[in-house]
Amino acid sequence: MKQLFLIIGAPGSGKTTDAELIAKNNSETIAHFSTGDLLRAESAKKTERGLLIEKFTSQGELVPLEIVVETILSAIKSSSKGIILIDGYPRSVEQMQALDKELNAQNEVVLKSVIEVKVSENTAKERVLGRSRGADDNERVFHNRMRVFLDPLAEIQNFYKNKNVYKAINGERSIEEIVNEMQKYILSFAN
């Protein structure tokens, strides 16, 4: 059975980089998928679905639920690795509920933990506006992305706390410290 770890955090929290490094350090057993990367890859294909994704992401809005869930489940099931890290998901209560429903309806994948990389809004803003990855990284869109992240956060945290799978990690430290803590935590489930 595949072990799933969801890594959430504000834009600029470092969740994608953390997950990439952990997967690289454990490439035999761990696969990493960034929801953002999966959606950007689809968008770049300029397919009908890709253009729809681009319409939402260029405004800092959430991509429709069914597109996101399809993309994620397809990535998990096609992976040859036993431990799957997905960052940037869930970003809404609806995404959380849809994934929970899908996970409960099958026995190939088990959710082991939801890890939140916690940073202040100031840290997130400095990182995102200093990074300028694309057209969506300007101040107006940053604030929209923060609102989209923060609005459902308490409900998402409580849902996973009630399932005893929520873990918070301080994202205000060096990348080495964050990655070491997260990696040790993830690997503790493999034993």
UniProtKB/Swiss-Prot annotation:
Top-level EC class as recorded in UniProt: transferase
Region (NMP): 34-63
SUPFAM superfamilies on file: P-loop containing nucleoside triphosphate hydrolases
Subcellular localization, as worded in the UniProt entry: Cytoplasm
Listed pathway(s): Purine metabolism; AMP biosynthesis via salvage pathway; AMP from ADP: step 1/1
UniProt keyword annotations, A-Z: ATP-binding, Cytoplasm, Kinase, Nucleotide biosynthesis, Nucleotide-binding, Transferase
Source taxon at top rank: Bacteria
A single GO BP: AMP salvage
GO cellular component, as recorded: cytoplasm
Catalytic activity field: AMP + ATP = 2 ADP
Binding annotation for AMP: 35, 40, 61-63, 88-91, 95, 133, 145
NCBIfam families per record: PRK00279.2-2
Domain remarks in the Swiss-Prot or TrEMBL record: Consists of three domains, a large central CORE domain and two small peripheral domains, NMPbind and LID, which undergo movements during catalysis. The LID domain closes over the site of phosphoryl transfer upon ATP binding. Assembling and dissambling the active center during each catalytic cycle provides an effective means to prevent ATP hydrolysis.
Chain's role: Catalyzes the reversible transfer of the terminal phosphate group between ATP and AMP. Plays an important role in cellular energy homeostasis and in adenine nucleotide metabolism.
Subunit structure: Monomer.
Name assigned to this protein: Adenylate kinase
Organism listed in the record: Helicobacter pylori (strain G27)
Gene this chain is encoded by: adk
